[in-house]
Regions:
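Serine-dependent carboxylesterase/thioesterase catalytic core
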Residues: 3-7, 14-17, 23, 28-31, ...
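Short, Lys/Arg-enriched, disordered terminal segments
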Residues: 1-2, 49-50, 185-189
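C-terminal catalytic-base region of ester-bond hydrolases, centering on the histidine
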Residues: 11, 122-189
Length: 189
């Protein structure tokens, strides 16, 4: 099964190198975007139709939210989100103002994009949410993975939730992540 991989904000497709090497699927297509220029719609447009045969969409962080949108593509046969802000980011006005990024506001709690994702149907395909449950950020006063609060990754779901003992970035180099993805692929494809 082919993989469509969408990286997180302020990252690149290089972040998937370990998973590409270790997972059973060796046919990966990565969507690259530039967070300084591309907005939510540009990233979606770069992702839609890039693979014209059956594939699994895998996204890390913001990329996981884009992967969920791919459920509307007839060729998308499954989705794996990795450390993604499934409920949307819980931001105050100061954080929104200081972020200087349209990507942050696009995935803020109650944004139109998060509402769209929550209102899509996922009953026609399997979804796996891999949640990073280790990490520390002194500015987040609750359990977090170093970037996202735990509750943001688990407060909404449209599939199975599986916790990985890693922080927000280590989860992409975790053997537990490789195992979970391989089991997801083996069980369903």
């Amino acid at each position: 099964m082919k993989i469509l991989a969408i990286h997180g904000a302020w990252s690149s497709s290089i972040s998937f190198n370990y998973l590409k090497f270790k997972t059973k699927s060796k046919i990966w297509t990565c969507v690259d975007y530039d967070h300084r220029v591309d907005d939510w719609h540009n990233i979606l447009n770069k992702s839609v139709g890039i693979i014209r045969e059956p594939y699994i969409a895998i996204g890390h962080s913001l990329g996981g939210m884009v992967a969920l949108h791919m459920s509307q593509d007839a060729n998308c046969k499954g989705i794996v989100t990795i450390a993604s802000p499934l409920t949307g980011l819980d931001l105050n006005l100061l954080q929104l103002y200081l972020s200087r990024s349209t990507l942050i506001s696009a995935i803020a709690k109650n944004s139109k994009h998060i509402d769209e994702i929550h209102n899509l149907s996922y009953s026609h395909l399997p979804v796996l949410h891999l949640v990073a449950n280790k990490g520390y950020n002194p500015f987040i006063y609750e359990a977090n993975d170093g970037v996202l609060p735990f509750k943001v990754q688990t407060g909404w779901s449209c599939g199975e939730i599986y916790e990985i003992a890693a922080n927000h970035y280590e989860i992409l180099q975790s053997d537990a992540t490789v195992t979970a993805i391989n089991q997801f692929l083996k069980k369903r494809f």
